[in-house]
Amino acid sequence: MRLKVLWVGKTQEEWVRRGIDEYAGRIGRYMSIDLAEARDEKGAAVEAMREREGERLLKLLPKNARLVLLDERGEQMSSPELARFLATNRDGGTQELVFVIGGAYGFSDSLRAKAFKTISLSRMTFTHQMVRIFLLEQLYRGFTIINGEPYHH
């Protein structure tokens, strides 16, 4: 299985980039990971921005990808539950598992329609920049749980 994480907009802060690089490198010890960003849309009506960003994200999706959206209204999982989800997909023959962090106004209906699952990291609201690090850390934590390593206690 290949892992891909997509998001909308450039990573603005250097310290966020360092965090992304750190956790992507750690994940790479367990599985191939690809990170990609779609250009964010500015200056249009909210629905138009969602649609344009959705189109850009759809173009970045590999064929046969199993799509997981991150949304505050999604299903909340514990770290062990996320680990089981990762293991089930890996062992069940999923070729590409793609996690997507949307833009400031969320996801287009066309992207939501393609989603296999929608999850939430928390009921709290975080910046889209911070969510990148939080998601990657949780994916790394999931792989350490799968492998019985002491990172998660």
Curated annotation (Swiss-Prot):
Is DNA repair among this UniProt entry's keywords? no
Superkingdom of the source species = Bacteria
| Residue ranges the record marks as coiled coil | none
Task: Extract one GO molecular function annotation from the record.
Answer: rRNA (pseudouridine-N3-)-methyltransferase activity
Task: List the InterPro entries.
Answer: Alpha/beta_knot_MTases, RlmH-like, tRNA_m1G_MTases_N
Question: How would you classify this enzyme at the top EC level?
Answer: transferase
Q: Name one GO cellular component term.
A: cytoplasm
Q: Which reaction does it catalyse?
A: pseudouridine(1915) in 23S rRNA + S-adenosyl-L-methionine = N(3)-methylpseudouridine(1915) in 23S rRNA + S-adenosyl-L-homocysteine + H(+)
Give its E.C. classification number: 2.1.1.177
Which positions bind S-adenosyl-L-methionine? L70, G102, L121, S122, R123, M124, T125, F126
Indicate yes or no for the key word S-adenosyl-L-methionine.
yes
Task: Report the locations given in the UniProt record.
Answer: Cytoplasm
Keyword line: Cytoplasm, Methyltransferase, rRNA processing, S-adenosyl-L-methionine, Transferase
SS bond list: none
Q: State the Pfam families in the record.
A: SPOUT_MTase
Q: How does it assemble?
A: Homodimer.
Its family?
Belongs to the RNA methyltransferase RlmH family.
- What is the recorded function of this protein according to its Swiss-Prot or TrEMBL entry? Specifically methylates the pseudouridine at position 1915 (m3Psi1915) in 23S rRNA.
Q: What is the protein's given name?
A: Ribosomal RNA large subunit methyltransferase H
Q: Which organism is it from?
A: Geotalea daltonii (strain DSM 22248 / JCM 15807 / FRC-32)
What taxonomic ancestry is recorded?
Bacteria, Pseudomonadati, Thermodesulfobacteriota, Desulfuromonadia, Geobacterales
